[in-house]
Structure formats: C-alpha cells, structure tokens
UniProtKB/Swiss-Prot annotation:
Protein's UniProt name: Exopolyphosphatase
Gene: ppx
GO-annotated cellular components: plasma membrane
Entry similarity comment: Belongs to the GppA/Ppx family.
Cell compartment(s), UniProt: Cell membrane
Species for this entry: Pseudomonas aeruginosa (strain ATCC 15692 / DSM 22644 / CIP 104116 / JCM 14847 / LMG 12228 / 1C / PRS 101 / PAO1)
Domain comment in the entry: The catalytic activity is found in the N-terminal region formed by subdomains I and II. The peptide that connects subdomains II and III is also essential for activity. The C-terminal domain may be important for the recognition and/or interaction with long polyP chains.
Gene Ontology biological-process entries: bacterial-type flagellum-dependent swarming motility; bacterial-type flagellum-dependent swimming motility; cellular response to nitrogen starvation; cellular response to phosphate starvation; glycolipid biosynthetic process; polyphosphate catabolic process; quorum sensing; single-species biofilm formation
GO molecular function (one): polyphosphate kinase activity
Amino acid sequence: MDLQSMPQKPAEAFPLIAALDLGSNSFHLCLAKANIHGEVRILERLGEKVQLAAGLDEERNLSEEATQRGLDCLRRFAQFISGMPQGSVRVVATNALREARNRSDFIRRAEEVLGHPVEVISGREEARLIYLGVANSMPDSGGRRLVSDIGGGSTEFIIGQGFESELRESLQMGCVSYTQRYFRDGKITPARYAQAYTAARLELMGIENSLRRLGWQQAVGASGTIRAVALAIKAGGHGNGEISPDGLAWLKRKVLKLGDVEKLDLEGIKPDRRTIFPAGLAILEAIFDALELEQMVHSEGALREGVLYDLVGRHQHEDVRERTISSLMQRYHVDPEQASRVEAKALKVLAEVGDAWELNGELHRDLLSWGARVHEIGLDIAHYHYHKHGAYLIEHSDLAGFSRQDQQMLSLLVRGHRRNIPADKLAEFAEEGDKLVRLCIVLRFAILFHHIRGTQEMPSVRLKAEPKSLSVTFPEGWLEANPLTQADFAQEAEWLKRVGYSLNVR
C-alpha cells in the first residue's frame, strides 16, 4: 500500500484511531479516540506474545511458523479495526522485520489481513516515537529525560526534554535475541548470565559517551521487561516501584539461585515472560552499570502511544496534564467562567496563606489550579452528590500525564471541595495529608467566595492563617448586607471543625 496516497485527514476527525506495534517479542494494538485538544483517550489495549525474532534463522529469513504466529495474531486484531478508514490506523513494525530479508512477504500478507499499510520503521524513528509516547504519558520533569526501551530484538535510548527528543539511538540487543543466544534451553547459570551482560556492555560502549555528554535528570524505562523487573523488585520489598542498583542486585541473585526459567514464579513476572526475563535482566543491569544510573522509573506510555500522538500530530511544548484538564472540562461541560473565577481566587488565597500553611510546593499550586478547574465535572452526571461523582470520574479515568498518586490526590481534592473533607483518605498520604486538608480549605474558600457565580462583585478580604485556623475579615458591614454569604461561611465553619480547623469570619 502507498502511504503517500492515504488521505491527509486530521486524526481528531475520525471516530476512532488505532496504532499497531509489530514488535520482535509482542504485537500490540491500541484503539483510541482523539479530540480537538490533542488528547488521545485509550479505549482498548490488546497484546500478544508472538516472538517474531525467534523465527529468524542464521540467514535472517523469517520462518513460516513465526510468520503464521504473527498473521494469526493480526487476524484477531483485525476484528477491532475492520472498516476503519485509511489514515485512521497506523501500523509500525520494528527490529525483527527490519532484520528479516524476506520481510516483504510478511508485509504483503499482513496488509491483506489488516487492510492498512505496514511501515517498517528505523531504529531511530522507533526511538522518536517511544519518546513521544513517554512524554505524553508522564508529567514534565522540567529537565532532560533518558528513556530506555528493551525490546525483543533491539534496545532504544533517547534523551529529550519536554516533548522533543534530542538524541536517539538503537542497539542490536533485545530480550528475545539474547534469549536465543544465551538462554535457549531455559537454564540460567552465572556463566551464561555473565556472557549476556558482557555482550550488552560491549554494545553500550558505542553510545555511552554521547549519552553522558548530553546528560539527563531522570531515567525512565518504557518496556514490558522493565515493568516486570520493577514489579518483581517491589514485590521483594526493595523499593516502591522504582528500580535501583540494590534492587537489581537482589533480583539477579534470586534469578541465578532459581537457575531455570520454569522456576521464575515471581510476582510481577507473567508466565509468558519467564523465558525472556533473564536476558532482559542482564541487559538492564548492563545499562545501569554502563550509565551509572541510581534510579529508573517505569512509564506505561511507549511506542504505540507515541504512534497515536504522532498520528494526531500534536507536538506542542506543553505539560500534557494541562491538556488533560482542558479535555476533562470540555468532556463534562464545565462552566469555564466559573472555573476561571474559582481558580483565580484560589491561587490568590494560596499566595497569602502558602507560607503559614507550608503550601509552597509546585505540586500544591498545580493541584489547586486543576482542582478549581474540574471541581464541577460531576454536575454532568447529577447535582446530588456531584462532588462524589467528580471524584470518581477523576480517580477512574485514564488521565494522560498524571502519576497514579497525583491522580488520587486530585480526586480527593474534588471530593473534599464541599460537605465533608475526607480526612481519613487524605491521611494516607502521610505528611502530605494535612497539607492536602489545607488545600481543600483553600479551594472551598474560593468556591464559597464565588457561590453567586459572578452575579455580584465581591469585596477584598484580609486573611490570616495559623496552624489550625483561618481568619477572614470582610469590609465592615458587608456580611450583614449579604446574608447568603454570611450563612455559607457559618456553615463552612461547622464543616471545618470536623477536621480540627477553625474558621473565624468577621
């Protein structure tokens, strides 16, 4: 199929868009919807282990058996994209098909099954798309990221900042190819592991210096192998989901002691990943040692998410979380004028009480800003208990760019913007718990202040915050002339007593 002949229609104009990633180890499908704000909302994810790379012979021809495994998987995927128009589906193939001398035969047959063109992308293009997927799935760290993705036949390295990758490399080492080379019979010995590790270190020598010269502030892993390692280390009690040298060393000892892939019955390692796990672990250890990494975090977003965002064509330098919040407001028909009023007042109050209440962190400001903008999304469901509806929507939605913890905190902020503040739930965040209670109080104040939704100009007030109290002084005689506001704040004082805070209004 001729890619140039595909209609150049904006992705958001399609009811659905899809990305297929034909990897060396697994095939993946993501079905999504894009909107005019550039947000991609994942509707369905499918993945199957195909191990295409295991079907490459010494002459780099793909076996008929491996080809059939791939085509059988694509036939199942085809049911999801049947009838989708040209331009709404992008199919990319990576290392195994880059290497296969007879790839044209597989591609022809795959296109007949799918009805859409298959692109074999270069290692560096793969790296670019991986980075795009990561950047759109994690909060902007403010500095450079090093992203590593251990695939079945290759491993990609990208350094970038914001939504732009600056350096992209692809090395010929992967968990399937190294399994074929060093762990073919499933036996795990120190000697074999050392061979795999050394081979990876030799591959890395060619790019170590260029990566170090550019530098990075955060290391991110974006593959199933890295996710499995992180889960296994966490299950073993060595961290909270991040990967560290100590955690890797513990896991390596554990794997070598077990000695056989059939015995790798460890939490986090799925049965269908056991055969390739030792090879992936050796590659990851080599990456840590070669680049002297102290920590790596895992990103759920990677190649297929990058393909979707590339299909949409949105590459602005922006915090993806801002785009997500804007999309929530649109989706649930939030009144933008009221949201803007509440946000402006909340941020003004934060500036006044931030020092006294230790709310000077960037995340505090972000959470308050986001909470002010989306606190009314539950109204789109029903007015009764709308704060609970809104909290549920935030907690259980896929919010691009948000960490799970940030999403939970935002959900509780929305839950606590009226009636009872969920202090017991907020307390689960340890020392941040009381600060989150204070953020709730700030947001609630801003909402009460604009309860009349802009129908009346509100006065300037003086605020004084103490550890367990907030004093508010209105202009003389104003409250008496505005009994609704007076009643609102009297009721609010009763709610705040329940969480140990006093509200003094005069």
